[in-house]
Amino acid sequence: MIQPIRNIAILAHVDAGKTTLSERILFSAGEVRRPGKVEEGLATMDYMAEEKERGITIESGVAHFEWKNTWFNFIDTPGHVDFGAEVDMALSAVEGAVLVVSAASGVETQTVAAFKKLRTAGVRTILYVNKLDNPDYSLDEALINIEEVLGVRPVLMTFPEYENGKISAVLDVLSQSRLVHSDTGEEVVDDTWNVDDGWDNSRELKKYYTEAVEFASNFDDEILKLAIDGKSVPPKMLLKGLRSLAASDEYALCYAGSALDGFGVRSLISGLSFFLPEVPEFDEAELGQVIRLRHFKGIGEISLFRAHSNLERRDWPTGFEFSRLRANLLLPVEEIRAGDIYAMRSPFETELGQVIVRDGTIETPASSWSAEGARTSDLAPRASNLKDCYQPLLQTRVECVSSEDYAHVERSLSVLSRMDPSFRVQHDDGGFWYLHTVGEVQLDVLLARLHREFGCEVMAGQPEIRWQERLCREISPVENTFQIGPHKISIKLSASPLDSDAHDIRLSAEFLENAPRDILAGVRSALLETTETGVLGKGPLVGICFEVLHFEWTEGALPPMIKKCCADAVTKLIKPADIQLYEPIMELSLECPVNFAGLVTGDIQARGGKVKEIGGDGRIHTFKADVPLRKIFGYATGVRSISKGTALYSLKLLGYRASI
């Protein structure tokens, strides 16, 4: 019998307990001897030095385990907004997911963002309400919050039992059983407990079973008939109905417990096996697809690879090697199975989304993604498409300590930019680089990795806000000529503003008709490249239409000459006075204890923020505000000081506003 495969991702807001739950899952499955603690830097899934130091997930860690004859590939994704591209790439490789909701904080900003990504990507999702080790946190309130904010009806599968103010067991709705801890800390069924023996929580367990039957009856006629006739529905039949329910958009199966104390985890894993889909069928002509790139010190670059074929080692293409990836360790395998995930080393440099056919040659699929993570095909995203989904908000100048290291730093930055589509590198003719990042955390991590993993000694300037530059008016044509020896290039160029953020390049009919394809492509590429740095150097030039009214060239003109001629023409054409700066405006979502609410809110207002939404429950204060990014640059340190480290916040780009 072929062992079924489940590819699962786990998502959450920062500090909801996602990695702690991942560790508990691995412990329950027997993959680790004890669950590693995030706060001690011992989490198995967070293997990078930066992850251990910061206590956050940066790269999507992959683990493998077996549970009751089902093989799981388990991907722990980052919760921090700076690493949203990691989440998008993880979702390209899975069919199911666990979304963790903290009972302490409820549905938070990144919870909503993650849920939206899951829905638009078509990934079936199971919820886990965490942090119920504290009886002061209400499961009922969390369920109401889920329904109100996420718009799905949670169907409860487990709930906690308390004794002396501590969680002591969980009740499993489907199996009608009670799970407690054994002497080794594992969850086991309590054989001394029976739901029909009149225990205090028996009535509540039966109530949730009846609710599950009621919800499942909307998807299963057999269950509906038994329910109408007033007959009991056996667990196996309910299981079948809940499988159909789990595939709907109206409901979400919900497990509840405490990852920290290891309650509710065993039932959750069984639920992942029961209710999440198996891997789909693939084209057997394909060996598989690159879904992620990784770099390890001492190992070098590897590709995370999703196999599309079953193939034994003797049939692997020449030069290819496949392994299991456990944190940063490579474990050899003797065969690959369709749908399974492996680490791959190949004789050539790979790119995200590349499909490799069985003979070892490459096809690069034309897939694309939206900013919300929606797949327009079943293929993993290519870096070139995913880059368009993330807007870098910071730019930082970096240069070598020693000029002899230039080539090494250049190669290292190339590897990092290929690994992370949201990170971009801009080369300057002066011998330095600008690093374009989504946020400060991403920048700090990249600089640390350059030093630790690649051995690069660089000097980094202070990060600056990336503004948008826009034309104020239509600009009359200019002419420019560039000549080296007998080779000459001339261009006549004008520019006008567009209402959108797009770039448009219009070529004269004569030029289009007479120029060869490589010349046309070279001109387009050269003009687009000038928009990356802008005129003032503050950020990209957007919303512009270049019109090439005339273009002449001599045979033998090289691409660098075209680039130089076009760049000089743009410099002639657009002056600083022609530019209006637009600054990024962020939506700040923050929560803190109520006793810090006044200080935190006052600080945001002093930074030019406009509070637009206030909430909370009398214990936790929440609010949303629109604030210019330049006013909250380095905000993490300030809010940590004001709130004594108790505030949590996230930022989302709303758009750009003209600077006064």
Task: Spell out what each predicted region is.
Residues 1-660:
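Structural and coupling elements of P-loop NTPases
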